[in-house]
């Protein structure tokens, strides 16, 4: 297992063009990243390009705000899987969590887990930069209760990204059997090593190539 094998090689900007997605895929093949993480519109293309490889196709659900209806998130999940996605990163309903509506948050996550039906890993983005520590812990517990495979720090589209402290808190909360994905602002090999040492088992980054090559990450994206 190498650092590259832990990275979801990511391109989620709304103006990302086909040539850039093609480059992302070729880089994933060259460096053997865990997955490519793309917007839903690119899932079918990525799945076709990655056919015959062990690289997963990851996409995002209810992204980046998490404010879609539960029914929409479930449909997005089924549609993405039908088009070739093998991993989905969903955003929780952040407002519901802050309102203390835990039953709704858990049901929202569970709907995506059930829509995936063992065909795709489900990673739950809790958007740590918007939460108190108590809310982070509660979100993690709800994700575990709903049957998610991973908890994830950030979308990369809000006010902050992954921190070592948040990764450690999330790992402590979910225990050893659930994955923890760090994303948002990870640009160097040292960043990755810090996240892993605090409990991360997957890294989301658009600077994957510079991370594994040891070059200084110059990508200005937040994910």
Swiss-Prot record:
Keywords in alphabetical order: Cytoplasm, Lyase, Schiff base
GO-annotated biological processes: 2-deoxyribose 1-phosphate catabolic process; carbohydrate catabolic process; deoxyribonucleotide catabolic process
Keyword Lyase in record: yes
Active site: 89, 152, 181
UniProt cross-references to Pfam families, sorted A to Z: DeoC (PF01791)
CDD domains per the UniProt record, alphabetical: DeoC
GO cellular component terms, A-Z: cytoplasm
Substrates-to-products reaction catalysed: 2-deoxy-D-ribose 5-phosphate = D-glyceraldehyde 3-phosphate + acetaldehyde
Keyword tRNA processing in annotation: no
Enzyme type, top EC level: lyase
Source domain of life: Bacteria
Pathways per UniProt: Carbohydrate degradation; 2-deoxy-D-ribose 1-phosphate degradation; D-glyceraldehyde 3-phosphate and acetaldehyde from 2-deoxy-alpha-D-ribose 1-phosphate: step 2/2
Protein name: Deoxyribose-phosphate aldolase 2
Natural source organism: Bacillus licheniformis (strain ATCC 14580 / DSM 13 / JCM 2505 / CCUG 7422 / NBRC 12200 / NCIMB 9375 / NCTC 10341 / NRRL NRS-1264 / Gibson 46)
Lineage: Bacteria, Bacillati, Bacillota, Bacilli, Bacillales
